[in-house]
Amino acid sequence: MTKKAEELKMHEKDTGSSEVQIALLTGKIETLSAHIKQFKKDKHSSVGLLRAVNRRKKLLEYLKKNKFDSYKNVLTQLNLRK
């Protein structure tokens, strides 16, 4: 698990909360973005990147709607802009 996800855990064994999922997706998005910059013709990875971005977007919308305090915390911790 990434360092960012470790900071957002609710408890020791937390792997499925929205906050942790967003942190893990953010790491995956950063990795895929770097890969696609190097290999521009890799269409399968670009599809995977779009899926990860859309999944993170849905999770952020859920947090904004249901747990606004946590939403603000996630945005500041992960340096995301909204």
Swiss-Prot record:
One MF term in the entry's GO annotations: structural constituent of ribosome
Segments passing through the bilayer: none
GO biological process terms held by the UniProt record: translation
GO cellular component, one term: cytosolic small ribosomal subunit
The entry's keywords: Ribonucleoprotein, Ribosomal protein, RNA-binding, rRNA-binding
SMART domains found in the cross-reference section: Ribosomal_S15 (SM01387)
PANTHER family for the chain: RIBOSOMAL PROTEIN S15, BACTERIAL AND ORGANELLAR, SMALL RIBOSOMAL SUBUNIT PROTEIN US15M
Binding partners and assembly: Part of the 30S ribosomal subunit. Forms a bridge to the 50S subunit in the 70S ribosome, contacting the 23S rRNA.
Family: Belongs to the universal ribosomal protein uS15 family.
Primary role: One of the primary rRNA binding proteins, it binds directly to 16S rRNA where it helps nucleate assembly of the platform of the 30S subunit by binding and bridging several RNA helices of the 16S rRNA.
Protein name: Small ribosomal subunit protein uS15
Organism: Pelagibacter ubique (strain HTCC1062)
Lineage start: Bacteria, Pseudomonadati, Pseudomonadota, Alphaproteobacteria, Candidatus Pelagibacterales
